[in-house]
């Protein structure tokens, strides 16, 4: 399993303003990630080191956002003022998770500004909606050259602080989650509080930044 990316749902300021805030905090530029037409969302991304990235996402006023769980999740987080939506784990095969959750993975599609398409499959967003400490799962279908990991970043993802219980996440993943998981620190706090990602720490050229 690979900690693939973290997702931030924008607040009232909107996508451009939130992306600029991250750019200033991390000292790097974000990129136009295009639209998720099947989910009713639009995003910008910041490439990170170690084949990871930061997704900054905004829901669109589009029927797809009302139907797709991902669009619903982004809208709900944004309506609460915005903040960390969750974390995402990449796997080679979604079949075991489809069997365990008793539903098929859904197809994802994102169009680049230059017209190219990025395709993947994902599952587990409904689990994230019900219990925001849980990551969802993704398998990339497109060639490596168009995946976000092809955009090599200099900022590193160091740590994710999660309100929740380690055992709950381990049961969801089907494997243990040590304090350092795939080279990323996974800290759990507030086991009896509202679950979800509380903060993310990055390592930049000028030091650590906790958001």
List each model region and its residues:
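A basic- and aromatic-enriched beta-loop-alpha substructure that forms the phosphate/nucleotide-
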Residues: 58-97
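Compositionally biased, low-hydrophobicity segments enriched in charged and small polar residues
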Residues: 8-27, 100-116
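Glycine/small-residue-rich interface belts in oligomeric ring/scaffold proteins
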Residues: 10, 15-74
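Short, surface-exposed ligand-recognition loops at beta-strand->loop->(often short) alpha-helix junctions
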Residues: 9-13, 91-92, 160-167
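Vicinal oxygen chelate
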Residues: 34, 44-47, 53-58, 86, ...
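Extreme N-terminal starter segment of soluble prokaryotic enzymes
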Residues: 1-4
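Amphipathic alpha-helical segments
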Residues: 16-29, 97-100, 165-177
